Structure formats: structure tokens, C-alpha cells
Amino acid sequence: IRDRLRSTNSLWASYKIIEGLTIKETISYDFIDNQSTTYWPMNSNNGEAYNGLMIKYPYQHHNIYSSTVLNYTNTFADKHNLDVLLGWDVDDRKEQFVQAVGANYPHDKLPELGNTSEPMTASSGYSEDHLLSLLSRINYDYDDKYYISANYRRDGSSRLGAVSYTHL
């Protein structure tokens, strides 16, 4: 038996602050709930040696992403074009699971872990990580002939330790 639910949602809004300056916010949420149960009956190839065998594996995943971007564009004296972007992204992820295995069931009609006389293994796990990014870009051109561009991005990740994330 496998029940799986996945929900992916995204929402964005943009607002013109003044002429040439806009802000855009994007928020996304991804959720997975997976409930997996496998039972091999007593007379099956996999279950015969264990007098019935069951594995349960519930798993959940949460991911929240947010992006905020300020963008400024302007043309000066009909020949100087400027485009400046400043933004930051936040990405938070959490996952958790439990796995339990049981064997030696009294009857095939009672395939629940609480009915086993021989719990074999149980394990669980939890992970969480965060990513924070700062980004910027400046584009300039003169009369659509001469271009210059500069970009900067800095990422801080909890996967690389507290110093990487907090000293962004």
C-alpha cells in the first residue's frame, strides 16, 4: 500500500514603487507526504522465511522558498541605459522518515507492526538545511553600442556550517 500526496504551490506579486523601480516577491511551498506499507504474507516467497514480513516507511518533505528582487531601470539623456538588480533568496528544507520492520505474525489478517512477535529493526531520520543568497547585477550601455555588466552573488548554506550561513 502506498499513499502519496504532493502539493506544490507558488505565489508572486510585483509592485511599482516609483517610476523605474519595482519590487517582486515570489514564495513557493513544496510538500510531500509518502506513507508506504509493504506486507509479504506467510505463504509468499519473501514472507515464508519470516512467517510474514512487514515494512512501514512514512516520509515527509517540506520546502519553502522565498525570493525578493528590487529592479531599477532608467535611461538618461537618451543614450545612457542603466539596469540595476538587488535581491535575496531564502530556501528552507526539512525531511523526516521512520522505517520499521516486523516479522513472525500470528495470522495474515493481522498485518500491523503491533501484532508482530518479532520486531526486527526500526530507524528514523530528520534533516534540515537552509540557504540564504544575496545577489546583485548592474548593466549599463551607452547608445546601445558599448556595454558593461557586473554581477555579484553570495550564498550561505547551513550544510557548510554555521560560519558560512551567518557570515553572509
Kindly label every feature range from the protein language model.
Residues 1-38, 55-75, 83, 95-97, ...:
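Outer-membrane beta-barrel transmembrane strands
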Residues 79:
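Catalytic core regions of nucleotide second-messenger enzymes
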